[in-house]
């Protein structure tokens, strides 16, 4: 971390997670877990350096990825989710898949070997290979996968639900619906509520519409909207309502 950064984080015990899920259920709210993979993994890599590609196992870029050429890493991912299956009854799980810093894979012998053996052209294809493997794992456990729109950059993800967040990339939402994926709209331009109020006001939110390029058939795959409030700098409910 850099000097002046805000300390945030913490953890939940299994009993605390169960309490949250039960509290939400009693109020008609479904809690869906997200463990971002293969990017946004620096916290795990800092604790377990073998999860990374070697060069990214220290505190650096938050989006440092897991080493996808290491079979032990793949088992780690399955083990993490297996524990969560017992805590969250929701049929949905969110794998993240956004903001992956692929430069580490380009310099990792294991990842390069994985790409060669599976005839994967680039980092996007390697991520797609990983995500498809995880989707098969989720399906085998009766779960449906959700991910951010970058996960489609390496190719189609059958049956995945896509969260379109890149406001400057409306084509991502159009491509997803056209491929038959269900989409939740939450672009930064309208639905990132940790942004300053000058950037997003109520009128702009209420005037949101899906990309004009979507046909009537495409629009049938739009499940709805989501407001995102990232809480790194929101330590309390009072700050949330500020």
Residue ranges and their predicted role:
Residues 1-143:
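Substrate-binding cleft of carbohydrate-active enzyme catalytic domains
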Residues 144-150, 155-160, 166-242:
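Flexible, acidic glycine-rich loops studded with aromatic residues
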């Amino acid at each position: 971390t850099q000097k002046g950064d805000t300390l945030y984080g913490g953890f939940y015990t299994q009993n605390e997670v169960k309490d949250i899920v039960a509290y939400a259920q009693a109020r008609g709210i479904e809690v869906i877990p997200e463990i971002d993979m293969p990017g946004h993994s620096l916290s795990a890599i800092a604790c377990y350096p073998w999860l990374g590609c070697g060069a990214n196992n220290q505190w650096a870029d938050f989006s440092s990825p897991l080493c996808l050429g290491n079979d032990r890493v793949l088992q780690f991912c399955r083990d993490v989710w297996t524990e969560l299956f017992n805590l969250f009854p929701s049929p949905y799980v969110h794998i993240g898949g956004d903001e992956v810093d692929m430069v580490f894979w380009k310099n990792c012998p294991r990842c390069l070997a994985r790409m060669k053996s599976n005839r994967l052209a680039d980092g996007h294809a390697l991520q797609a290979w990983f995500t498809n493997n995880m989707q098969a794992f989720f399906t085998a456990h009766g779960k449906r996968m959700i991910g951010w729109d970058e996960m489609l950059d390496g190719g189609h993800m059958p049956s995945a639900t896509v969260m379109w967040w890149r406001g400057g990339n409306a084509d991502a939402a159009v491509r997803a619906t056209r491929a038959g994926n269900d989409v939740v709209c939450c672009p930064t331009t309208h639905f990132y509520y940790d942004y300053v109020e000058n950037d997003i006001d109520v009128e702009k939110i209420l005037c949101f519409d899906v990309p004009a390029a979507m046909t009537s058939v495409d629009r049938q795959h739009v499940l709805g909207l989501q407001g995102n409030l990232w809480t790194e700098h929101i330590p309390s409910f009072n700050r949330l309502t500020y």
